[in-house]
């Protein structure tokens, strides 16, 4: 038995260039934790959650994270809080995969 939910969730995710694959790590009535694996030149398009806070945890690679028009190229490990209503997204401009989780709470 392992307490780690991350390794098993992303083990089989291997997106092609330009593609994003996802896995739900935790889903409860209150919170969603979802893994995003970005292939080279892939993106999670900017979007917002009006009623929820979304926290990105960069776990692998070097994605560029966008929040409210500001962007930063990050290297794992990194954490980016996205408050309610913040327009946020991520893209991978490298030749390797990038992995981040998004923790969203409260759920609508």
Predicted feature descriptions by range:
Residues 84-108:
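Ligand-binding loop in jelly-roll beta-barrel domains
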Residues 25, 35-37, 55, 79-81:
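Conserved hydrophobic/aromatic beta-strand scaffold that supports enzyme active sites
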Residues 1-34:
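A short, N-terminal "cap"/entry segment at the start of jelly-roll beta-barrel domains
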Residues 69-85:
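Short acidic-glycine-tyrosine-enriched beta hairpin
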Residues 49-50, 94:
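Short glycine/proline-enriched turns and hinge-like loops at secondary-structure junctions
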Residues 51-68:
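Glycine- and acidic-residue-biased ligand/ion/polar-headgroup-sensing regions
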Residues 34-49:
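Conserved short histidine dyad/triad with adjacent acidic residue
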């Amino acid at each position: 038995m392992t307490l780690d939910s991350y390794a098993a969730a992303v083990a089989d995710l291997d997106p092609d260039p330009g593609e994003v694959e996802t896995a739900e790590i935790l889903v409860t009535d209150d919170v969603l934790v979802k893994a995003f694996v970005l292939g080279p030149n892939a993106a999670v398009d900017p979007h917002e959650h009006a009623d929820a806070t979304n926290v990105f945890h960069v776990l692998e690679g070097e994605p560029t994270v966008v929040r409210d028009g500001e962007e930063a190229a990050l290297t794992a490990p990194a954490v980016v809080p996205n408050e309610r209503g913040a327009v946020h997204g991520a893209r991978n401009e490298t030749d390797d995969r990038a992995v981040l989780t998004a923790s969203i709470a409260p759920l609508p």
